[in-house]
Amino acid sequence: YFPTAEARNATVKFGAVEGGEQNLARLDAYAQAEAGKGRSSLENKPFIISRTYDAPRELVFECFTKVKHMKHWWGPRGIKVVKPSLDFRPGGMFHYAMQTPDGSLMWGRQIYREITPPSRIVLVNSFSDEAGDIGRHPGAPDWPAELLTTFTFEEVASGKTKFTVRWELMDNASDVERETF
């Protein structure tokens, strides 16, 4: 909040209406680049995918925060989300099973680290067992046990949202997991 409209207009003109968020985003990119200097060939770069949706940012964000939405789109085509439980808060968990057409179950979990509505969710993603303990990918045992995952939601036009997902290796990833990723 700004004390006057003039103060807000000056801040907008300067390009800093979101406070220090832009600086912190640039610091994040710079620090990661600096930290990557001199790393071994086993240090992997993040895997990033973006897509723009013809839907408001608040709705796209909400589709990641409520089971009533997630059960309609989460997982590969032909897979049904079953037994979902969601505790959407930092430290909370989304635990679920994906059921294949033959009835097989594959469990997964997300442990939330940071939630900044409606712009960002940071979590640790992994396969799991039915109890919610970390598991291995059923078809790729060398796949990383955990991935740091960041979802960002950016309003790019009136009623449109650019969604980006970024997967990164955790510091504790083994050399085999790093090569697989």
Write out the residue ranges for each language-model feature.
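Hydrophobic ligand-binding cavity/cleft-lining segments
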Residues: 37-81
